[in-house]
A protein has these predicted regions:
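Aromatic-rich peripheral "rim/lid" segments of glycoside hydrolase catalytic domains that contact
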Residues: 126-197
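Active-site/pore-lining binding-face segments in mid-to-C-terminal subdomains
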Residues: 89-141
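Arginine residue identity/basic-tract feature
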Residues: 53, 60, 68, 88-90, ...
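Compositionally biased, low-complexity repeat tracts
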Residues: 17, 23, 76, 118, ...
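Glycine-centered small-residue hotspots that permit tight backbone geometry or close packing
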Residues: 10, 27, 48, 80, ...
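A structural motif corresponding to the C-terminal end of an alpha-helix
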Residues: 10-22, 107-120, 181-197
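Extracellular glycoside hydrolase catalytic/binding regions
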Residues: 1-110
Length: 197
């Protein structure tokens, strides 16, 4: 990893020389290797991370650790939750997805400038629409069928990740895919949150 972060630092330095008017961010997996980033990539301006930590959000310690090691602003470059839970009704799964997103939204808002740790720039929801090709390769898995095979255990409602079910909108039953978009409960949640924020 130190070679990787050293290379990131070289890139950030070059970008700054070519375009000093824009910040340079890194996309990291959660808060792994903060010590190495601090030592080998000081030229980055923004710490970005893909983080999937559960319905409660990211946890204050996430933002505190970034502040302690890097003293840089944080952008959550990817967060989300599947809208499928094995053996549970669709409505239950969608509500679980929405509550997960709500926890993430609240945690981000509570740690923006002037609040909490104060180092959050924002977050990027993963993702707009379900992707039916992510469960695995043909012939075992089909891109024309939304798979319900769990990919790995994780901090999600029901305890499992279902990679093809992250969308704020679904593709329905697939008869009109890839063009049909059906709004999920989490889409409606964000619609309301943006009105109030």
């Amino acid at each position: 990893p130190k070679e990787y972060y050293g290379f990131i630092n070289e890139l950030a330095t070059w970008i700054h020389s070519a375009d000093p008017g824009h910040p340079v961010a890194i996309g990291n997996g959660d808060i792994l290797f903060l010590d190495l980033i601090a030592k080998h990539a000081p030229a980055i301006d923004i710490f970005g991370a893909n983080a999937y930590r559960g319905w409660h959000g990211f946890g204050r310690s996430f933002f505190e650790e970034v502040q302690r090691w890097l003293a840089k602003p944080v952008l959550i470059t990817e967060f989300g939750c599947p809208a499928y839970q094995a053996g549970r009704p669709r409505e239950t799964a969608e509500t679980g997805q929405a509550m997960y997103h709500l926890g993430s939204w609240v945690d981000l808002a509570d740690n923006m400038a002037g609040r909490g740790v104060g180092n959050v720039l924002g977050g990027i929801v993963f993702e707009w629409s379900d992707e039916w090709w992510k469960a695995g390769q043909p012939p075992r898995f089909s891109p024309t069928v939304q798979e319900t095979h769990p990919n790995w255990a994780g901090p999600f409602p029901g305890g499992w990740n279902f990679e093809e079910w992250y969308g704020l909108v679904s593709q329905g039953n697939g008869a009109l895919s890839p063009f049909l978009r059906q709004l999920r409960t989490s889409y409606q949640l964000y619609q309301e949150l943006w009105k109030r924020f």
